[in-house]
Amino acid sequence: MNLEALLDTVPAYARDLKLNFSAVVRQNTELTEQQLWGTVVACAAASRNRTLLDAIVEEAKGKLSAQAVEAAKGAAAILSMNNIFYRFQHLAVNKKYETMRAGLRMNFLRQHGVDPLDFELWALAVSAVNGCGKCIDAHERVLLQKEFSEEKILAAIRVASTIYGLAVVFDAEEPKGDLVGAPVNTDAYSTTTI
């Protein structure tokens, strides 16, 4: 399903999210197309709703290079890992963890092949979705040091929050039932007692 058709299925209780999508994505004036659509793709991937991600990636292919689409998905992947690790360090009462080596590969942070500031913005947005304050502060600091404006940062966070909200709506509205291709446990439906 294309993105517009998917957005047309947004129920009345989530109308604000559909309107926000129009305002922060369709009517965006703060971010470049790559900054915007990379943020949209990265946040959709981090929000983990397959229906929304598929529709967004399909539309993004007309706005981003294939490399940028992959880099945005890569930002969601590597930052989701980092967000868990660094959020643990930040929240743990035992501060010794902050002095210990991460021991996790993070090469993609330097090998994504897109503008480093754009990638940094996507990393910040994914960190907001995943709720890692330590990562939010680190990525915001890099952007501000490179004279990236707070208005642009907040524009990306508006996108992140809207995409996450839409993912929640589509999760809530997706029909439930057996997973396609998964074996069905017929014993669960048996009326015979053992």
UniProtKB/Swiss-Prot annotation:
Q: Name one GO biological process term.
A: response to oxidative stress
- Work out whether the entry's keyword set contains Disulfide bond: yes
Q: Which Pfam families match?
A: CMD
**Disulphide bond pairs:** C132-C135
Provide the top EC class.
oxidoreductase
- Could you tell me the keywords of this UniProt record? Antioxidant, Disulfide bond, Oxidoreductase, Peroxidase, Redox-active center
Domain of life from the UniProt record: Bacteria
| Catalysed reactions, as listed in the record | N(6)-[(R)-dihydrolipoyl]-L-lysyl-[lipoyl-carrier protein] + a hydroperoxide = N(6)-[(R)-lipoyl]-L-lysyl-[lipoyl-carrier protein] + an alcohol + H2O
Chain coiled-coil ranges: none
Q: What does this protein do?
A: Antioxidant protein with alkyl hydroperoxidase activity. Required for the reduction of the AhpC active site cysteine residues and for the regeneration of the AhpC enzyme activity.
Under what name is this protein listed?
Alkyl hydroperoxide reductase AhpD
Organism expressing this protein natively = Koribacter versatilis (strain Ellin345)
Q: Which gene encodes it?
A: ahpD
